[in-house]
Amino acid sequence: MAKKSMIQRELKREKLVAKYAQKRAEFKAIILDINSTEEQIWKAQIKLQKLPVNSSASRVQRRCKVTGRPHAVYRKFGLCRNKLREYAMAGDVPGLKKASW
């Protein structure tokens, strides 16, 4: 089980990403626009750098919804490999069955 502080830190990051997503997208659009002048691009880069570091989507790490484990988390289920196996063997994940060939 992950520490509660680590789980809360990830939740805080997710909130920051949602809060600044619009601004971040606008600045990136200006930077990537071919018609933007060098001065506009430069100002947009400065503003983008002044945003909080944790407002970047790449800073958010997927965690298991049950244990908070940060590694081996399946996106489709939101569970780590250990809990996914445990729930699958108990029949709690609909449509999932053990492979056999």
From Swiss-Prot:
Disulfide bonds: none
Keywords for this protein: Ribonucleoprotein, Ribosomal protein, RNA-binding, rRNA-binding
Single GO MF descriptor: rRNA binding
Keyword Mitochondrion annotated: no
Top-level taxon: Bacteria
GO BP annotation list: translation
Single GO cellular component term: cytoplasm
Protein family: Belongs to the universal ribosomal protein uS14 family.
Family annotation (HAMAP family): Ribosomal_uS14_1
Task of the protein: Binds 16S rRNA, required for the assembly of 30S particles and may also be responsible for determining the conformation of the 16S rRNA at the A site.
Complex formation: Part of the 30S ribosomal subunit. Contacts proteins S3 and S10.
PANTHER family in UniProt: 30S RIBOSOMAL PROTEIN S14 (PTHR19836), SMALL RIBOSOMAL SUBUNIT PROTEIN US14M (PTHR19836:SF19)
Protein name: Small ribosomal subunit protein uS14
